[in-house]
Every structure is written in C-alpha cells, then in structure tokens.
Curated annotation (Swiss-Prot):
Superkingdom per UniProt: Bacteria
Chief site of localization: cytoplasm
Listed NCBIfam families: hisS (TIGR00442)
Name of the protein in its database record: Histidine--tRNA ligase
Length: 424
C-alpha cells in the first residue's frame, strides 16, 4: 500500500464544518469594511525577496528566520509573503494608485512564516489587512481603530478585547531613543539573554518585546520612548487620543508597545485578549509614512493594520459560540420514491429562484423517511419539505418544522411565502 501524503506541519486543511464558521466571520468583517468605503485589492502570494527585505528590515526576525524563500528556474529569489502591507504598497506604486490620491484598501488571504506551530499561530496563516494611503492626520488613525471596534461589537467579542496604544515618533526621535536605550542596555548586559544581546545593536527596540521575566524587570528602569517624541508626533498622538475619547473607545497607553516591522512610525496599536489563555494579539497596526518612498514611490502618508483570522476564529468560538452556530442548510427536501425525484429537483430550483440566499439541500441517494430525516438533522436543517407521489399529484408539499415538529400541507405555488414566514 502506498504511503499516505499528509499536509505540511503548520499548514492546515479547513474542512466544511470549519469553513462555514470562517465564511460567517469573514462576511461580517467584509460588510463593515464596505460600510466605511474600503475596496478590496487582490495581491500575489509570491513576491520578489528584496521587497520584504527593504520593507520589513533585514535585521528583523521575520526576514532573518521566518521567510519561505527560494530561487526559481531563472535564478530569481522569491518569497512567499509573510505579511500583506509590503505587497499592497508595491501594487499601489506599480499601478499608480498612490501619489496625490486617497486610497482605502483591504485584502485577505494566506501568509507564510516558518515559526514553531502552536494554537492560533501556524506556518500558513490567514490575515485580513486594511491600508489607507494619502491621509496623514490622526483622524484616519482613529477611523481605523473605530472600524475594528465595530468588528468586535458585530462579532459579540467587544468585552474580551482591549486596545493598547503608543506613539513611536519620527525616525529622528526614534534614533535618539535608540541611542539612549542601547546605552542603558550596555550597562546591564549581564541581565540580557543571548537573543537580547544580539538585538541590542541590530534592532534594540525589539528588546522591549522580550518575554524573559528578568529582562522585563530590567526594562522597568529603562528610558521611555515617550520622553523622546518630537513635537509633531506628540501633537498627533494627543489628537488621536482625543478622538478616541470622544468616540467612547477605551484604551491603555503602553509605552513599551513597538511593532515587529521596521517601517512603522508615530501611531502603533494592538487589540489584545486574555480569553485564549495567555495574552495574545488579535489585531495590530500603525502608521508607516516612509514606506512608500522607501519602496521607490513618492512620499505618501499611510496607515493600516492586519488581523490574524485563526486567532479571531478561536476567540469567537471561545466567547460567543452562538454567533457561529448557524446551520449548514435551512431547508432539506425529502423525496419519497424515485418517481418524485424529478418533481423534487424542479421544486428546489424554483424555491432557489424565489428565495435568493436560502440554503436548500435536496436528498439524493434514496433512503426511507427515517434515513432522510436523519440526514436533515445531520445538516442542521430547520425545515423539511416532504414530497411524495400524492403531493406531486395534487400540487402540494408537506412543510415540517423540525424544531417544533408541526407540519402542514401547502400548495407548491405559495410555499415560498410560507417558508419566509417560518424562517423569519
């Protein structure tokens, strides 16, 4: 017997019961994006490797350790995208979408990082991201955060996520802070682990993310980035906080919050949760005003975020399972006997025409009534339609509410109206 070929570790199959959950959540997210005027952009999964090195930073964990990079037959270095912002910016520059224009864009799809697989974090994972180009005020930063807050309310998880904010200032302000932080860390090298020692000179702000408790204790005495902000960044951040206060969105200023990618400036934010065990990030983003120019375009202000869908699905399942408890089908059509199958399929097609969006499944493969009703239960149907030879002859169909057990014979010409009443 041939050996079974299995999925690559950390790259998962999503089976029909799971994809139904994903589709419901994704549909909610897309509806909210549409209500804010955001448009979808579809991007390649594979990009030229230099794109990510220039955008993300060569001395980041993503570029150094996590990217899936390979040479194609022409000898070009290509990479499976580890995140979406760089590709979105590349597309905007390439197609002339950005200079002197406003764009509100979103994308969704798989990303790839060679990390140790764990719950909610995989080597192939899915993100939904939104990017705004051409607007530089704190009001658009606030709009993005308000948009995400509306998601949480729509998904019924608002009480289980909290917002953390920070400003990491301009490039110049961050450079001054970097020097002060390195000087502090050099005085306490005996407390640093090997990873922090390596980062101390290549990317010292990443030391602030260390999970080492000894390093975290040390950082309580470290310089604070907020003390090094330039006046424009300080004013921008104050404006953002004022807008969020007016909108009633609670937040915590976390002065250790930095982002893992080098292109960020000024606003950075994360939505975090404690409802999945240890604290985890659900959605994160910030401003990256220099990235378009860094990738060859003209200077363009930009801000955006990305959300990991695996972790979001886990959170919704954990705290609001009712949201995803929707049936696979609404109506199951039971046909009694081979002679009625053609009439059943004709009726099903007519109902699909008259009731767009209804999920209706017709029984195929025969079976007695007991087996067919068992299949209706398996698919989670609320209503069964029963069509036998007598119903075909007199133009009726039996409508059975599978929750209450009540049933009635209804003329086929008026069954759609009757079903709409039952389904609400």
């Amino acid at each position: 017997m041939a050996k079974n070929i299995q999925a690559i570790r950390g790259m998962n199959d999503y089976l029909p019961g799971e994809t139904a959950i994903w589709q419901r959540i994704e549909g909610t997210l897309k509806n909210v994006l549409g209500s804010y005027g955001y448009s979808e952009i579809r991007l390649p999964i594979v990009e030229q490797t230099p794109l990510f090195k220039r955008a993300i930073g060569e001395v980041t964990d993503v570029v150094e350790k996590e990217m899936y990079t390979f040479e194609d037959r022409n000898g070009d270095s290509l990479t499976l995208r580890p995140e979406g912002t760089a590709g979105c910016v590349r597309a905007g520059i390439e197609h002339g979408l950005l200079y002197n224009q406003e764009q509100r864009l979103w994308y969704i799809g798989p990303m790839f990082r060679h990390e140790r697989p764990q719950k909610g974090r995989y080597r192939q994972f899915h993100q939904l991201g939104a990017e705004v180009f051409g607007l530089q005020g704190p009001d658009i930063d606030a709009e993005l955060i308000m948009l995400t807050a509306r998601w949480w309310r729509a998904l019924g998880i608002a009480e289980h996520v909290s917002l953390e904010l920070n400003s990491i200032g301009s490039l110049e302000a961050r450079a001054n802070y970097r020097d002060a932080l390195v000087a502090f860390l050099e005085q306490h090298q005996e407390t640093l682990d090997e990873d922090c020692k390596r980062r101390m000179y290549t990317n010292p702000l990443r030391v602030l993310d260390s999970k080492n408790p000894d390093v975290q204790a040390l950082l309580n005495d470290a310089p604070v980035l907020g003390d090094y902000l330039d006046d424009d960044s300080r004013e921008h951040f104050a404006g953002l906080c004022k807008l969020l206060d007016a909108a009633g969105i609670a937040y915590t200023v976390n002065q250790r919050l930095v982002r893992g990618l080098d292109y960020y400036n000024r606003t950075v934010f994360e939505w975090v949760t404690n409802s999945l065990g240890s604290q985890g990030t659900v959605c994160a983003g910030g401003r990256y005003d220099g990235l378009v120019e860094q990738l060859g375009g003209r200077a363009t202000p930009a801000v955006g975020f990305a959300m990991g869908l695996e972790r979001l699905v886990l959170l919704v399942q954990a705290v609001n399972p009712e949201f995803i408890a929707s049936p696979v089908v609404d109506i199951y059509l039971v046909a009694a006997g081979a002679q009625t199958q053609s009439a059943a399929m004709t009726l099903a097609e007519r109902l699909r025409d008259e009731m767009p969006g209804v999920k209706l499944m017709t029984n195929h493969g025969g079976g007695n009534f007991k087996k067919q009703f068992a299949r209706a239960d398996k698919w989670g149907a609320r209503i069964a339609l029963v069509l036998g030879e007598s119903e075909v002859a007199d133009g009726t169909v039996v409508v059975k509410d599978l929750r209450s057990g009540e049933q009635t014979a209804v003329a086929q010409d008026s069954v759609a109206a009757h079903l709409r009443t039952l389904l609400g």
